[in-house]
Amino acid sequence: MTENEQLLTSVADKARNVRPWGWTSLPEPVDAATLARAEAALGFPLPPLLADLYLRIADGGFGPEYGLLPLLDSPPAGEPATVTQYLANRESGREDPDWPWPEGVLPISHWGCAMYACVDCRSPQATVLLFEPNADDTDQAWYVDAPSLKEWLRVWLDGTGWYEETNEDAEQTPWADFRIRTAATAPAS
């Protein structure tokens, strides 16, 4: 069994036994046609591991805190689906250039208080970013949550994430590529 297969098996086991807030049951996985429609709407492919989570485990409803968002349809908790949220964030960034949303950065899980876990679909390792806009400063709103989606999932499985009570004071590393990826310039003072 490969490392990814072992990880997917562990995630599937926990997904069957732990419900995030707002989810009463684990949804069925998406089919290949749904994944293709999502990728067409986004304009880029999902990283293979993220695609496998949706294709093999469930259409959201598992993972830390509120769990993964569904790919195309709204979940029972009322959060928008991943594709819907990404497209809305990109549009909002065009309307408000002080808050640009990076291309290819897909929100996959809502933390509450407008915070999201996002996968950088352009990075080879599928870096997971934390979007935390409550500082009211775009340069202080993006952090590296985990260097890869694999690591982010392992941290959830191990119960060692920053969002756990025992780790809530953990420092986050700012995402250095934010300005490069948004091609935004600092507002004039």
How should each PLM-predicted stretch be described?
Residues 117-151:
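Segments surrounding the PLD/"HKD" phosphodiesterase catalytic module and close analogs
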Residues 126, 138, 164, 171-175, ...:
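A ubiquitous, low-specificity "background" feature that marks scattered single residues
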Residues 1-115, 170-171, 180-189:
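A surface-exposed partner-binding patch
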Residues 68, 81, 134-138, 145-148, ...:
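Short, surface-exposed, polar/charged, turn-prone segments marking secondary-structure boundaries
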Residues 143-178:
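A short, charged
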